[in-house]
Regions:
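Hydrophobic helix-and-loop "lid/oligomerization" segment in the mid-to-C-terminal part
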Residues: 2-25, 33-62, 77-84, 162-284, ...
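Short alpha-helices
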Residues: 111-179
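Short, hinge-like loop/turn segments at secondary-structure boundaries
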Residues: 67-70, 126-129, 274-275
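Active-site cofactor/cluster-binding pocket
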Residues: 65, 71-123
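Glycine-rich, phosphate-binding/catalytic loops in enzymes
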Residues: 37-39, 103-106, 126-127, 178
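Generic detector of well-ordered alpha-helical packing
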Residues: 25, 29-31, 91, 113-114, ...
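Short glycine/serine/threonine-rich phosphate/pyrophosphate-binding segments
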Residues: 29-35, 94-97
Length: 313
């Protein structure tokens, strides 16, 4: 593995003719927004570009241009293509890209912002001080004088905004706001993006009401937990955004924990914090992320996983 500079990244992209873009499994707004924007940018530079995700693109992100160009692994297994570069966006570990890595032997490049990055790629461009990979892509386009179209601006604004809580989280910096402003200048409409992403159906609201009943507090109300059981996960799938923020906003709470029952003996966890390093907590269980936002999977039933987390915190 070698960490590369912005100039080395630019040179590698200039030399590549055929590029495959991918992101992590269970893709979020930053992953999808960054990928489709980078896709459009690279096509604009005359490159042959493909997109693959070893998962389903969440419905709420399909309003973005070029999401219909994203294929699953099975598509490329039956329609193989030759590539010069596998570009991994917003993924901090090799395991997070699923089966994608096994399909090609091309050099792996990684553009990421997670402090927990395992440096799995052949070439890594890491910016842990950036709030989102979308912020990195916007910054690259600016520094390389690549035009940001309206559709790119929309995708990149969504990428940035969703990874910093629409600019409410502590990872929001002056540069974050500057890059978001460039997206708006390109034609992104923050109100439309926010309304599209945050729209709530009546059925989801009914489920939220039920989930609220699972909220519990620990350690003098400084830790709060909220739970999604197997039934709720069947209904929601990976669309669990927002649940952890319900408890994060409680004034006494420093650590908010969302526990999602994936199986009888497997619990997926999302951690948010106002002060404690939750990346360290997640790393204890084999996960990672950021200082104030991280995640992990614990091979225990939900209630046991909850107790294990509270003991570590």
């Amino acid at each position: 593995m070698s960490k590369i500079t912005i100039n080395q990244l630019h040179m590698a992209l200039c030399e590549a003719n055929s590029i495959m873009l991918t992101v992590h499994i269970r893709p979020d707004g930053d992953a999808i927004g960054s990928m489709v924007a980078f896709y459009e940018a690279l096509v604009g530079q005359g490159k042959t570009v493909y997109m693959v995700v070893d998962d389903v693109v969440p419905e709420k992100y399909t309003f973005l241009r070029y999401t219909d160009h994203i294929h699953d692994v099975a598509y490329f297994e039956t329609n193989p293509v030759d590539i010069d570069m596998l570009m991994v966006l917003d993924a901090s570990t090799y395991e997070r890209i699923g089966k994608v890595g096994a399909l090609w032997s091309a050099p792996i490049f990684n553009i990421d912002h997670h402090i927990s990055n395992t440096e799995f790629a052949d070439h890594l461009y890491l910016k842990p001080d950036f709030a989102a990979t979308g912020e990195i892509v916007t910054d690259l386009c600016r520094k390389w004088n690549w035009p940001i179209t309206e559709s790119m601006g929309t995708a990149l604004y969504m990428a940035i905004a969703t990874d910093c809580g629409f600019f409410k989280f502590s990872n929001t910096t002056a540069n974050t706001l500057e890059m978001a402003a460039k997206c708006v200048a390109a034609g992104a409409r923050p109100n439309v993006i926010s309304e599209t992403i945050e729209a709530v159906s009546a059925s989801r609201l009914e489920l939220i009401k039920q989930v609220m009943q699972t909220i519990e507090f620990y350690k003098n109300d400084t830790i709060a937990t909220i739970e999604l059981n197997r039934e709720a996960m069947t209904i929601l799938g990976d669309d669990t955004d927002g649940f952890v923020d319900i408890i994060r906003n409680v004034d006494t709470v420093d650590v908010a924990i969302l526990l999602k029952a994936e199986a009888d003996n497997r619990t997926r966890v999302s951690l948010r914090s106002k002060g404690i390093d939750v990346n360290a907590v997640a790393s204890h269980f084999g996960g990672g992320g950021h200082i104030r936002a991280a995640g992990c999977t614990i091979n225990l039933p939900l209630q046991e996983a909850k107790q294990a987390l509270i003991e570590v915190i």
